[in-house]
Regions:
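Active-site phosphate/ATP/adenylate-binding loop shared across adenylate-forming ligases
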Residues: 1-19, 60-167
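N-terminal leader/targeting and accessory segments in enzymes
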Residues: 1-55
Length: 167
């Protein structure tokens, strides 16, 4: 369902996406429930299971995991070998949370970004100078915000990339 949701022709079509969204959340919840003991324990503590997600109003019952939870521990639902891209939070308070993306998740995200960029005419062959309000990417900086900011410069050929922050 995730792939179908991310491949919708019109990303803003609520009617077409509502049922797919619910099914994708249920599918995602079931995956993490089956592959991550820590996540399963949290859901069970709140008497929640993926099958509980039957209608849109059930989404509000899905236990939220605060950012602080991930800063204090590393939990994964997939082996590190399947994580093609790893990123961290900025760690502004001294602790970073970590996330990994597999090929399927990256492809879904890329397809949606391309679809939205096309819809808003963001692609161009005309070169541009980019000013990024963030850090320049390098091996020591694995923050997701840096990777995302760099990705935003791929919509049109870059004449230059100027970064506002120094690492």
């Amino acid at each position: 369902y995730r792939r179908k949701l991310f491949r919708l022709r019109d990303p803003y079509d609520i009617e077409a996406s509502q049922d797919l969204f619910l099914q994708a959340v249920r599918e995602n919840c079931a995956y993490h429930y089956a592959h991550c003991g820590e996540y399963r324990a949290i859901l069970e503590h709140f008497h929640f299971s993926p099958e509980t997600l039957r209608c849109e109003t059930d989404l509000a019952r899905l236990p939220a995991l605060p950012t602080a939870f991930f800063k204090g521990r590393e939990i994964y639902s997939m082996p590190r070998g399947r994580q093609l891209v790893r990123a961290t939070s900025s760690g502004t308070k001294g602790q970073m949370s970590r996330i990994g993306f597999d090929a399927g998740g990256l492809l879904c995200g890329l397809e949606m970004v391309v679809r939205i960029a096309q819809r808003h005419s963001l692609f161009s062959v005309r070169p541009a100078h980019y000013i990024l309000l963030g850090y320049k990417p390098h091996r020591g900086n694995q923050t997701a915000v840096t990777k995302t900011a760099f990705g935003a410069t791929l919509f049109t050929p870059a004449l230059s990339r100027t970064y506002a922050l120094r690492y």
